[in-house]
Swiss-Prot record:
Keywords: ATP-binding, Kinase, Nucleotide-binding, Phosphoprotein, Serine/threonine-protein kinase, Transferase. The active site is at D1390 (proton acceptor). This is MAP kinase kinase kinase SSK2. Present with 217 molecules/cell in log phase SD medium. It comes from Saccharomyces cerevisiae (strain ATCC 204508 / S288c). Its EC number is 2.7.11.25. Residues 1266-1558 form the Protein kinase domain.
């Protein structure tokens, strides 16, 4: 097939003759207007051979293979990219792109101008009209070669769209083009608009030549398809000529290539596409960067310290005590240490050698070494001069004048029956009537039977089960006896009469026996029922096999191995659901809660009777019901872990999803273990918890922290995108801090991970600061400089403040260890013995090393595990009374422990979202509690909460019950005379098991339980020990946690040091661009506050604190210098700044700090203070003289204020408030209950199952491991959810179609099959991708591409799109997708804004093909795809076949009339036999959508109902067109072409792509690419 044949192939019977070969091979010097393509390959013969083998689709992006329109994308390739339009105006660089949010809909401030669709990367020139090309004068641009497409290995794997190419009936011949053409760019389409535009406009120099295989040289470009005779190639403006269709198709193919190429070259959103890579080690780049230059910092510190023997390099010796005093005043905060001050007194010797006060070396060293240093310094006159000046400054600044002026400035910003016998008679008469007797006979019969009942009562009193009787046998025996009792009971009208006649039945022993037997039978029946229900639930959720059916009733779940296998499969199945907590509540906790509660209640109440009857306890059944959810959640965690660990470099979106999953699973696991452990207390019943359960939860925690680290540290290393990282840490700290109390080995893990993450955040903050100081960004103007400076202030201030708060929380939570020095060994041992302490013998391992453990009296008689928990720091970080927030029916399990009394009972209700729940009610005072979502809340008026006194009593009781362990390391031999406790042989403690570094002659106190009890335990121990010990330090007993906290303190110091030391770099950088004094003054204010916060909050030794104080003193001098030299003295603001700066300087040089300044610094300080005082005096308003004069002037010039605007503002606020309240009420009314359908085993006799098997056997049936997320909306016949693919973490959309019965399946099956068949063959960026189908017994899931941006209808709810260029871009994408559909033989038939979605890049996607139909070659609708075999093996047609050329009857016409009336074409409503071109009805619908985008109103918005709309459309009317102010004339003509009544005259989608209005936006989008291509090829 020749190249010309590709462009003259006529799939719809075009009778136009093909151009001759000679015309297709014109020379490059031809003067005709031509379209130019890239070279057609190196070997044309090979290319032609490939072309002959199979047709390919327009828009194919690779030249390596060829596909039809239903070809599959490469795995992982994103089907759509953002349209990036760039400006072509002179003076603007090519390829310059605006930010996605840079498009402003209009200059107005309405909500309509801030809509989402504008975020598509469209750059707007300052004058859009000048940027548009003139259609009649533009030369034909050329294009460049298409770059090689990415290989499949370079693309992130993603579920590939499923396309069916095997069924010949489903394959539609489409426009066939050459393989080389499939990857070409398009040309400027403006030349195709009018006949006069197709002229000789391209010179020969734009047409490069290439060598042909035969050695000849010719022009092998797409311009060869255009003949020299322009009249033969004329294109009517509305596509009226015969040849125009062919030309449109050719141009459509060319334009499609460039369009698809632009889609693929989009800039992806990092949230969905960027893989987050974990750091290879803990010392990440941020820490390394912040450590860069540490040597320089230490050298500076050496120069500042001048203290010998100071260990400055030890991270773990940076201020041991984490106690932050809350009583520090400002004076004490800024006091330097005496040792540091000694190193700063050299100025006394070097100040002036001529003065007689010079000090000799020997005298100087004697002064510094003396104990009365301060008194000797006061004898020096120069020191006295400084203190005198300091006193004078303090008096001035604290005087009345300055205080009054400050008050004035501060105030400037402030503004101004029947009786018993009668009822018995009725009962007797009814009884006689029912038995056909007289009343007398009935009375006689009852007396005889009543006299014979004594034997039954005696049997009950003597009843006792035999030993070793099985539960089933016992149930039969008990049931027989109980049935006798109830038959006897019917002989009396009520129990009260029976008690009166038979006193034995009134005894407590008899009633207890009856109650116990009834309860036992009820428990046996309900336990068996619930166990069978759970097993059926497990087996019933197997996925439907596509070929065979499995009888799930034959599965033996009593076999533990079989049950474990099915349980794992079941866990994997329910993991797909979006809300695991809700599933556990509805399916497990709610049905089991009352019976589990009653099981414990009745046993404790009737335990004595239980033993008398020799009843066996149903402990195995109860254990199964308790342990089943724990086993299930364990399997869920393990399965989720296996999937999560397979994902390499997850995106931020995947990380968020996994964090939500694992936090939910861990929370459920902890709640269930706590509930089971509490339930088993106080009675004989015990369960054995899986020893691997805790390990699984810890493993889940470890992975959670690994992805939390990625989530917090994901952003670029140059800046912080948000300051939410500490908030995220605080959120999960509140969630997990008590987990260590319930899960073994979790406490220390949580503590270590939180401190590690906090440390890394502080390092990142320091690294960010250093980057801004040393390598600031290029600031082009004053606005950029101001934005940069404000960003630094916000990030440093906000992050430091939040991190400080979180660090303080961690520090207090992890302080569980205090170290004392032993002063009197013998007295200490004596006191410990007398107060009941005991020696804990660990097996000799610790004792051989000189370390001994001594327990407090509270621990005597405790379990070994309790002591080991103290040693292992298991409860580190927990609350004093650890509690869990349980918002489900697990709270009912242990209701006996929560204010249960004789008046208590269970009540049930259903929440607003359909979730059932139980609550405890008291018959005397109760009202039902409300249920809000998954949270149970008591109404405040009826809440039986404990008083404050009771809560304090609980805390006090808990505190008194806690003990402590002393780790004693004496220098002397230990002779213990008190009590001793031996640990079990398997519980011995070895030195390496003691996570503590001991030092000789010390005693370490490790408290039990929460770290918040440490203060209380320390006070107790110090009262016991007296003066025999002295305090050394308080810290965490975990070495890892302690070291991390020490490193955090050092990181805070280094960050503060950098702020104060290098503030001049920030000032210099800012002053180069903007000399705004207000912002420069804020730099000094920020430095002051940053330093003071460190001194008040953070921990450091005295020498390090002194360094910060000295730097702050230098900062104060620099601040005063700035005010005196750079600021305008007449500015009122400078007065306020001077007062603040001098007060800061006075505060910093107070006390002995003033001696740390050298003479030069002190002189500069005095000079700048004098200048600032002069400035203050010029602003002083003595006795108000100046203010009175200014007030007189202001009164003369003051005008009356119009308060009308104020009232108008108040009215608008009230209206807005009412509108919001109304919206909230409407939203609450729309909340519906979500019923749940229970699956059934498939039945061969059910006709509906044939449909399921047909769908399951489809080639697009996939086996995908996924998990449901949020509800999105409803489609034509299903509900749509977002979901995550567990194999790769990608987000999908899942249309869930519920199947009620066979009739509903027969009704919706054709629609499902039709939509699947349509989606399988489609593959285009503007059509939602289809990934496959998953078939179950009660529902069908269809997997499709997820569109994050929502629907176009939701977008238009905010108003019209005021920017016409944005409307053009959307229309272009809509036409591209519609043209592809029609070229593939698909008619959508329901085009409307609700079926048009936008992905996360704002690109249009067609969706919901439930109403679409596929047209075969002969123009008839395909029906074979909707045939299935019935029960007799014959084919049954489940759809109606209609001819597109003639409608046979009204029934078929009504079936073809599908869509939404306000968007339906006239021929669709009237059932006209004149259908016009293929897809003409879609074009009408498209015009209605464009009309709505322009006007913001739905078509026919002025009509009341759909019948009126259909009447007007059928009558030949058209919707109301927009005004001239809303759209240009070109856009108006485009709408006219779309909304032509006659479908034969209505333009097709391909023709509309050549409309000037669309050509205009295409020219702006792709014009520059064409011109740049020409330059590259000529080079």
């Amino acid at each position: 097939m020749s190249h010309s044949d590709y462009f003259n192939y006529k799939p719809y019977g075009d009778s136009t003759e093909k151009p001759s070969s000679s015309k297709m091979r014109q020379s490059s010097s031809s003067s005709s207007s031509r379209l130019r393509s890239e070279s057609l390959g190196r070997n044309s013969n090979t290319t032609q051979a490939r072309v002959a083998s199979s047709p390919i689709s327009p828009g194919l992006h690779s030249t390596q293979y060829f596909r039809s329109p239903n070809a599959v994308y490469s795995p992982g390739e994103s089907p759509l990219n953002t349209v990036q339009l760039f400006n072509r105006l002179p003076g603007i660089p090519q390829g310059q792109f605006f930010h996605q949010n840079a498009i402003s809909g209009s200059s107005s401030s309405s909500a309509r101008s801030s809509r989402r669709p504008s975020n598509i990367g469209l750059p707007l020139p300052k004058n859009p009209q000048q940027s548009l090309p003139k259609l009649s004068t533009q030369p034909v641009p050329v294009h460049k070669k298409v770059e090689a497409s990415k290989t499949e290995s370079e693309i992130i794997k993603k579920p590939a769209p499923v396309n069916s190419n095997q069924d010949p009936l489903l394959t539609t011949p489409t426009l066939v083009i050459s393989p080389e053409l499939a990857s070409l760019n398009t040309t400027n389409t403006s030349i195709m608009s009018t006949p006069q535009n197709i002229t000789n406009q391209t010179s020969n120099k734009h047409i490069p030549t290439r060598s042909q295989p035969n050695g000849s040289t010719s022009s092998s470009t797409l311009q060869d398809i255009v003949t020299t005779n322009s009249s033969q190639r004329s294109v009517g403006h509305h596509g009226g000529s015969t040849t125009s269709l062919r030309t449109y198709k050719k141009q459509y193919v060319l334009n499609e290539q460039l369009y698809l190429r632009k889609m693929r070259n989009r800039a992806n959103d990092d949230y969905y596409t960027r893989g987050i890579v974990a750091s290879s080690n803990f010392e990440d780049d941020e820490e390394n960067f912040s450590n860069k230059g540490e040597d320089d910092l230490e050298l500076e510190m050496d120069d500042l310290l001048k203290v010998e023997g100071e260990d400055k390099d030890n991270d773990f010796n940076f201020g041991y005590n984490f106690i932050t005093s809350s009583t520090k005043n400002n004076e004490n905060v800024v006091s330097m240490s005496l040792n540091y001050l000694k190193g700063k007194l050299d100025w006394l010797r070097d100040v002036n050698n001529d003065q007689p006060c010079e000090i000799e070396d020997e005298e100087w060293h004697s002064i510094l070494g003396s104990e009365d240093l301060l008194s000797k310094l006061l004898q020096n006159p120069m020191v006295n001069n400084r203190f005198e000046w300091q006193t004078m400054l303090s008096k001035v600044l604290k005087g009345d004048i300055v205080r009054n002026e400050k008050t004035k400035i501060a105030n400037q910003g402030k503004g101004p029956g029947f009786n018993t016998q009668f009822s018995d008679d009725i009962w007797i008469e009814l009884k006689a009537w029912m038995n056909g007797r007289t009343v007398e006979d009935q009375n006689k019969s009852l007396r005889i039977f009543r006299d014979s009942t004594d034997s039954v009562f005696q049997e009950i009193m003597a009843f006792k089960l035999e030993d070793n009787m099985s539960a089933d046998e016992a149930a039969e025996t008990i049931k027989s006896l109980v049935d006798k009792y109830y038959r006897v009971l019917n002989l009396w009208p009520n129990i009260k009469r029976m008690h009166a006649e038979k006193p034995i039945t009134k005894t407590e022993a008899f009633r207890n026996r009856i109650d116990t037997l009834n309860s036992w039978l009820n428990f046996k029946f309900n336990f068996d029922t619930n166990i069978a229900y759970l097993k059926k639930w497990i087996v019933g959720n197997k996925e439907l096999e596509s070929t065979t059916e499995v009888d799930n009733t034959t599965v033996n779940l009593d076999d533990p191995a079989v049950f474990a296998t099915n349980c794992k499969r079941f866990a994997e199945q329910i993991m797909k659901e979006k809300d695991i907590e809700l599933i556990f509540q509805k399916k497990i906790f709610f049905p089991l809660a009352p019976w589990i509660l009653k099981a414990k209640f009745f046993f404790l109440k009737y335990q004595k009777t239980w033993n008398e009857l020799n009843l066996s306890y149903l402990d195995q059944d109860l254990e199964f019901l308790l342990m089943f959810p724990m086993r299930l959640v364990k399997d869920i965690i393990l399965i989720r872990l296996s999937y999560a660990k397979k994902i390499q470099n997850p995106t931020l979106m995947m990380i968020d999803q996994m964090m939500d999953d694992f936090s939910t699973y861990i929370k459920l696991a902890v709640q269930m273990k706590f509930t089971v452990a509490s339930y088993c207390n106080d009675w004989f019943f015990k369960v054995k918890i899986d020893p691997e359960f805790d390990h699984t939860v810890v493993e889940g925690l470890e992975y959670f922290f690994s992805i939390l680290e990625l989530r917090i540290l994901y952003s670029g290393k140059n800046s912080f995108k948000t300051s939410k990282e500490p908030d995220l840490l605080l959120k999960y700290w509140e969630m997990f801090r008590n987990v260590g109390y319930y899960i073994d080995d979790a406490g220390e893990l949580i503590a270590a991970e939180f401190t590690k993450l906090t440390l890394r955040l502080v390092h990142r903050l320091h690294a960010y600061l250093l980057r801004q100081q040393n390598t600031p960004p290029k600031l082009e103007n004053e606005a950029a400089a101001e934005k940069w400076l404000v960003q630094i202030f916000e990030i440093l201030g906000s992050m430091k403040r939040k991190l400080n708060r979180f660090t303080n929380i961690l520090t207090k939570a992890f302080q569980n260890f205090v170290r004392y020095k032993i002063e009197d060994h013998n007295y200490l041992l004596k006191q410990l013995k007398e107060t009941g302490h005991f020696l804990i013998y660990t097996g000799g391992y610790l004792e051989q090393n000189g370390t001994y453990l001594i327990g407090s009296p509270e621990l005597l008689g405790c379990k070994d595990d309790d002591i080991l928990r103290i040693i292992k720091n298991s409860d580190i970080g927990c609350d004093l009374v650890p509690k869990l927030e349980i918002n489900n029916s697990l709270t009912i399990y242990n209701a006996l422990d929560d204010n249960w009394n004789s008046n208590s009972s269970l009540g049930s209700d259903i929440s607003n979202d359909g979730t059932p729940f139980y609550y405890i009610k008291n018959d005397l005072t109760t009202q039902p509690r409300s249920y809000n979502g998954n949270r149970v809340n008591r109404e405040p008026d009826f809440e039986n909460s404990r008083s404050t006194e009771e809560e304090f009593y609980e805390l006090e009781t808990r505190l008194n019950s806690l003990g402590y362990v002393l780790v004693l390391t004496p220098q002397e031999p230990l002779l213990w005379e008190g009590e001793m406790y031996n640990l079990s042989d398997n519980k011995t403690i070895k030195p390496e098991g003691l996570n503590l570094k001991v030092i000789p002659n010390s005693i370490d106190l490790m408290c039990q339980g929460s770290s918040y009890a440490l203060e209380y335990q320390c006070d107790r121990f110090q009262q016991i020990s007296g003066s025999s010990v002295s305090f050394l330090e308080k810290k965490s007993s975990s070495e890892t946690v302690k070291n991390n906290l020490q490193r955090i303190n050092k990181a805070y110091f280094r960050c503060t040091y950098s702020v104060l030391k290098n503030y001049t770099k920030i000032v210099t950088t800012f002053k180069k661009v903007s000399p705004v004094n207000d912002l420069l003054n804020n730099i000094f204010l920020f430095g002051r506050d940053f330093g003071l916060n460190f001194l008040r909050i953070n921990v450091a030794n005295n020498e390090k604190r002194s360094i910060i104080i000295l730097l702050m003193m230098r900062l104060s001098i620099g601040w005063l210098k700035f005010l005196a030299e750079d600021c305008d003295p007449t500015d009122q603001r400078v007065f306020r700044w001077c007062v603040t700066s001098m007060e800061f300087a006075m505060h910093m040089v107070s006390g002995w700090n003033i001696l740390a300044l050298d003479e030069c610094q002190f002189s500069s300080l005095k000079q700048k203070i004098s200048e600032c005082m002069s400035l203050l005096i010029s602003h002083f308003d003595i006795i108000g003289a100046r203010s009175i004069e200014v007030e007189k002037i202001n009164q003369q010039a003051r005008s009356n204020l119009d308060l009308e605007d104020v009232f108008d503002d108040d009215m608008m606020l009230q209206v807005n408030s009412e509108f919001r309240v109304q919206s909230i009420m409407e939203l609450e009314e729309r909340i519906k209950r979500n019923p749940h359908q229970t699956g059934k085993v498939i039945d061969d006799s059910d006709k509906g199952n044939k449909y399921l098997v047909s769908l399951a056997s489809s080639i697009s049936n996939v086996s995908m491991r996924w998990q449901k997320r949020n509800f999105i909306g409803g489609g034509t016949f299903g509900r749509v959810y977002s979901a995550v693919d567990l194999d790769n973490g990608e987000i999908l959309a899942v249309k869930e179609i519920n199947i009620q019965d066979s009739k509903s399946m027969q009704k919706i099956f054709p629609l499902i099959k039709e939509e699947m068949s349509v989606l399988e063959i489609l593959n285009h960026p503007n059509i939602v991708s289809y990934y496959g189908v998953e078939v179950h017994r009660d529902k069908v899931n269809i997997f499709m591409e997820y569109c994050e941006g929502g629907s176009l209808a939701a977008l238009l709810e905010h108003g019209r799109i005021e920017d016409e260029m944005v409307t053009q871009v959307y229309t272009l994408q809509l036409l591209e997708g519609l043209a592809y559909l029609h070229e593939s033989g698909i008619v959508h038939r329901d085009v409307k804004p609700e079926n048009i979605l936008l992905d996360f890049n704002g690109v249009i996607k067609y969706v919901d093909f439930g109403a679409a139909k596929k047209i075969a070659n002969n123009g008839t609708r395909l029906a074979s795809m909707n045939k299935i075999e019935n029960a007799d093996g014959e084919h049954e047609d489940v759809t109606h076949v209609s001819d597109s050329k003639a409608v046979k009857n009204n029934e078929n016409a009504l079936l073809d009339m599908m869509g939404t009336p306000m968007y339906m074409a006239p021929e669709s409503i009237t059932g006209s036999t004149t259908k016009g071109k293929l897809g003409a009805d879609d074009v009408w619908s498209l015009g209605c959508v464009v009309l709505e985008m322009i006007t913001g109103r739905r078509p026919w918005a002025n009509l009341d109902n759909e019948w009126a709309i259909m009447y007007h459309v059928a009558a030949g009317h058209t919707p109301q067109f927009p005004t001239k102010d809303e759209v240009s004339s070109a856009g108006m003509k485009f709408l006219e072409r779309c909304l032509i009544q006659n479908p034969s005259k209505r333009a097709s989608a391909v023709e509309l792509l050549m409309d000037p209005w669309i050509v205009q936006i295409r020219e702006i989008a792709f014009g520059d690419d064409s011109s740049s291509t020409d330059t590259e090829e000529r080079e």
